[in-house]
């Protein structure tokens, strides 16, 4: 998620900086200067009971660039003074007493009690989004941008919701807007509340004024007693209202729950609270760009309902817990009743609740959008039903339940039974599944001695049975698409057809509560690499990284990376693919890689440790421009969290054209002991690769401690008549050591390799050079049958730069490299040395900008990189 935020904030940051430069605004460089004043406002007129006051003073008078990139949004609504009641703690509602303070990540709130004992909530309309950003983004540009994006939320939207909720028979509060003056009577809460426009509403918005529960209490109750249930149809109505008004922020803490005692159990009905994101909309270019793929759930209030699956992203786990029993017919009926109830007149009345000063700005437009969305709700709602129905979670409780799975008429039926104190069974859950809609059903028993009976499941529906804690019993007479997960240390009983048993001694997912189970969406992220070095010139490339998710596969089911890189000087390109597929066979991961270079930008000076480079010959002459395609696949087993073993096939294809090398060293191969007929013939190899790897570094981008150790054994057989077999071993060890409080980092690298084959091709040789292991020398400067190298590097943090656009860490690098290659029948004790240094910069501590120079007896070489690693080369 950090990558998403950084791309979004960087795009917005450029606009913000441009706006400030244009307006000559002062940039706050100290976070401590922010805080309590950020949400204050001041009235333009006051009488005994009312103040003419804007909701906020932060979002008005935007520059052209701010409007263009960050949007006009609802800035006028925030800035227009509105006749607002004045809050007087001694007189409002007959007098109130503050009992506690609270609030979410962005709002400040207090709980109050009136003289009858009824509780009320008073919370800010404006917000402080500081806490929503991770620590590395707690910098001025990010704080200013995220603060400014509050203008995309309509400050008075909560006033419009009750009329729609009333028409649709959804419990709701009646919010009132108040201006809280700087009143000494507020005591210790004065600093928190003074000079703010706030919303006052009842804490328990139940129709009968009975006490409601928060979601945490609800989860405790429904887990401990299986006769406590959710009114799912009422919840669906409330979620349809969320979709209608584009309220995307509907996670589990945005709800309270009323209770109906039936005499045989309790039914909890939902009460939506905190309608702060209703009508959310930004027309800025930055938000439009971000919502294309990165933040699609924030598309906001448009005439059409876009990407309904993503609109429910914040409620992805919530919906899978509490909308899992409703079938297609119930959805259609509920949606139909909802759209019929929310008439044009209801929408007009609802939007008409906006203050008269505010309505003319966007009121007519909001009315038109709501009517249009209402008309699309049947289609969008059923699309969301199908999305939720693809994979369905069915939960038990901490008591004993009987899960019964059967089939008939091409459908799979799941029933969950509990029992009362007399032992009489009652139905907790019942639903029939269509294999055309549902691909996977997951049963979670949690605690209790649960019983699972699987008579038969529809062939196209995968069934996962998660026993949980307790002595569970399993009776299976099913096809092969049943997977069992239970603790092997627990006494469980299994009879009948054996399922695919995924039980383990430490089944972490069997001990969760339903709200602990996180459903992740598949996502793709853009990648970019930009660099410069003396040999390759300007390098630029783009790509993407994709994550897919599946049951109990952490941190993802698959990761796919596809990157490209182009050398403008060498007129060459490369395409790289890397894939990881988690637990494809038991706990074995599948890893795959492929690389195409056309041509490779390698050098060749001959074989041996003391090959000469003519001072009168241009480097162009030593370029070896051949092409190759390499692919690898392997099964990887993680022996520990830091040690892995992988084994699999490898393929290599080489081809070369004389026309690409006519004026280069490969155009005169006899100078370096090569045969022209051999170097221009196509060669294909296939074989296997064994890799042993240790990875204990603490950060992939900029490690400060840990170890990377890769040991690689490769054997290839020739598939063409002139392709010789190759056997090669390589080892590379890098140790990162924090020498002083993460400010001084020592890096030690040792490595080398050996070719066991008697003969090998020039492009297969062990090499030293460039930025790989001997900086200051050209790429692949030395080539032989064996190699050894040592790199010693010191990275010293110089300062934390509090730049507005690119705050980050600035440091210096110093290094010394030494290496040697050997050839059979050659005697050489020469070790090649180089040294150098440079600067690195870590904006947001997420990616690296580096500039280094390597100095050798032959020349000085420069490298500038922007990406995820120091030293980008082709």
Q: Language-model segments: which ranges?
A:
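Outer-membrane beta-barrel initiation region
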Residues: 283, 455, 466, 472-590, ...
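Transmembrane beta-barrel strands of outer-membrane/channel proteins
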Residues: 528-532, 560-566, 590-609, 647-653, ...
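C-terminal catalytic region of ATP-dependent kinase domains
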Residues: 26-29, 150-151, 259-430, 435-442, ...
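Outer-membrane beta-barrel "beta-signal"
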Residues: 689-690, 860-874
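C-terminal outer-membrane beta-barrel translocator/porin domains of Gram-negative envelope proteins
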Residues: 519, 576, 605, 615-622, ...
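Residue-level signature of outer-membrane beta-barrel architecture
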Residues: 467, 530-532, 546-548, 566, ...
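Conserved ATP-binding subdomain of kinase catalytic cores across diverse folds
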Residues: 85-216, 246-247, 267-309, 313, ...
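Outer-membrane beta-barrel translocator domains and adjoining extracellular loop/strand segments
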Residues: 555-557, 574-577, 602-610, 657-666, ...
């Amino acid at each position: 998620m950090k990558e998403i935020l950084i791309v979004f904030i960087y795009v917005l940051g450029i606009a913000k900086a441009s706006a400030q430069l244009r307006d000559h605004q002062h940039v706050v460089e100290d976070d401590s200067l922010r805080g309590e004043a950020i949400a204050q406002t001041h009235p333009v007129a006051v009488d005994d009971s009312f103040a003419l006051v804007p909701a906020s003073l932060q979002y008005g008078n935007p520059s052209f660039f701010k409007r263009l990139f960050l949007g006009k949004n609802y800035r006028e609504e925030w800035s227009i003074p509105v006749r607002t009641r004045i809050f007087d703690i001694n007189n409002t509602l007959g007098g109130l007493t503050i009992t506690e303070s609270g609030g979410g990540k962005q709002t400040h709130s207090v709980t109050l009690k009136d003289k009858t004992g009824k509780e009320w909530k008073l919370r800010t309309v404006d917000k402080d989004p500081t806490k929503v950003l991770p620590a590395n983004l707690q910098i001025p540009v990010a704080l200013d941008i995220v603060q400014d994006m509050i203008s995309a939320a309509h400050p008075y939207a909560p006033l419009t919701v009750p009329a729609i909720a009333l028409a649709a028979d959804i419990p709701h509060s009646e919010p009132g807007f108040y201006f809280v003056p700087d009143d000494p009577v507020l005591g210790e809460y004065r600093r928190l509340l003074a000079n703010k426009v706030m919303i006052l509403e009842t804490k328990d918005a139940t129709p009968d004024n009975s006490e409601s529960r928060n979601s945490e209490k609800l989860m405790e109750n429904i887990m401990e007693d299986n006769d406590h249930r959710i009114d799912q149809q009422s919840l669906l109505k409330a979620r349809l209202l969320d979709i209608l008004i584009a309220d995307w922020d509907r996670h589990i803490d945005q709800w309270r729950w009323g209770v109906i005692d039936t005499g045989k159990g309790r039914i909890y009905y939902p009460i939506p609270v905190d309608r702060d994101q209703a009508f959310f909309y930004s027309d800025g270019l930055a938000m439009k760009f971000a919502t294309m793929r990165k933040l699609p759930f924030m598309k906001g209030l448009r005439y059409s309902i876009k990407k309904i699956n993503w609109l429910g992203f914040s409620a992805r786990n919530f919906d899978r817990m509490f909308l899992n029993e409703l079938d297609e017919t119930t959805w259609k009926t509920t949606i139909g009743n909802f759209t019929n109830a929310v008439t044009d007149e209801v929408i007009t009345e609802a939007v008409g609740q906006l203050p008269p000063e505010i309505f003319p700005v966007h009121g007519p437009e909001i009315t038109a959008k709501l009517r249009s969305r209402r008309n699309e709700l049947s289609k969008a709602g059923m699309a969301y039903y199908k999305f939720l129905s693809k994979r369905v979670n069915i939960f038990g409780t901490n008591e004993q339940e009987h899960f019964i799975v059967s089939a008939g008429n091409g459908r799979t039926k799941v029933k969950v039974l509990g029992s009362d104190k007399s032992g009489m069974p009652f139905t907790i859950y019942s639903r029939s599944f269509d294999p055309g809609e549902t691909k996977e059903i997951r049963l979670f028993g949690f605690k209790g001695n649960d019983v699972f009976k699987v008579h038969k499941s529809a062939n196209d529906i995968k069934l996962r049975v998660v026993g949980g804690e307790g002595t569970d019993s399993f009776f299976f007479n099913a096809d092969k698409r049943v997977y069992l997960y239970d603790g092997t240390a627990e006494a469980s009983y299994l009879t009948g057809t054996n399922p695919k048993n995924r039980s383990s001694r430490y089944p972490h997912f069997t001990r969760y509560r339903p709200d602990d189970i996180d459903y992740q969406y598949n996502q793709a992220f853009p990648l970019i690499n930009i660099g410069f070095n003396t040999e390759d010139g300007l390098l630029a490339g783009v790509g993407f990284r994709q994550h897919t998710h599946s049951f109990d596969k952490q941190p993802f089911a698959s990761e796919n990376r596809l990157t490209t890189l182009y050398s403008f000087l060498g007129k060459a390109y490369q395409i790289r693919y890397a894939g990881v597929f988690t637990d494809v066979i038991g706990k074995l991961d599948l890893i795959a890689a492929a690389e195409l270079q056309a041509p490779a930008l390698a050098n060749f000076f001959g074989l041996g440790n003391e090959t000469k480079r003519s001072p009168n010959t241009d480097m162009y002459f030593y370029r070896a421009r051949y092409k190759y395609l390499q692919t690898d696949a392997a099964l990887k087993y993680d022996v520990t969290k830091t040690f892995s073993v992988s084994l699999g096939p490898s393929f290599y294809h080489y081809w070369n054209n004389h026309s690409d090398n006519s004026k280069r060293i490969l155009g005169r191969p006899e100078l370096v002991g090569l045969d022209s007929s051999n170097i221009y013939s196509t060669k294909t190899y296939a074989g296997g690769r064994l890799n042993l790897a240790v990875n204990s570094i603490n950060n992939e981008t900029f490690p400060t401690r840990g170890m990377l150790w890769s040991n690689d054994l490769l054997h290839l057989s020739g598939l063409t008549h002139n392709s010789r077999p190759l056997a090669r071993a390589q080892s590379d060890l890098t140790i990162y050591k924090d020498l002083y409080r993460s400010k001084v980092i020592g890096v030690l690298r040792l490595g080398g390799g050996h070719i066991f084959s008697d003969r090998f091709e020039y492009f297969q040789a062990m090499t030293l050079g460039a930025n790989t292991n001997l900086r200051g020398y050209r790429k692949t400067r030395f080539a032989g049958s064996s190699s050894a190298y040592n790199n010693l590097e010191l990275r010293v943090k110089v300062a934390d730069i509090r730049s507005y656009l690119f705050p980050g860490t600035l440091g210096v690098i110093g290094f010394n490299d030494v290496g040697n290659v050997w050839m059979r029948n050659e005697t050489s004790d020469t070790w090649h040395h180089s040294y150098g240094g440079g600067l690195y910069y870590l904006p947001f501590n997420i990616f690296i900008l580096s500039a280094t120079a390597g100095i050798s007896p032959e020349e000085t070489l420069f490298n500038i990189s922007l990406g995820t690693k120091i030293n980008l080369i082709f």
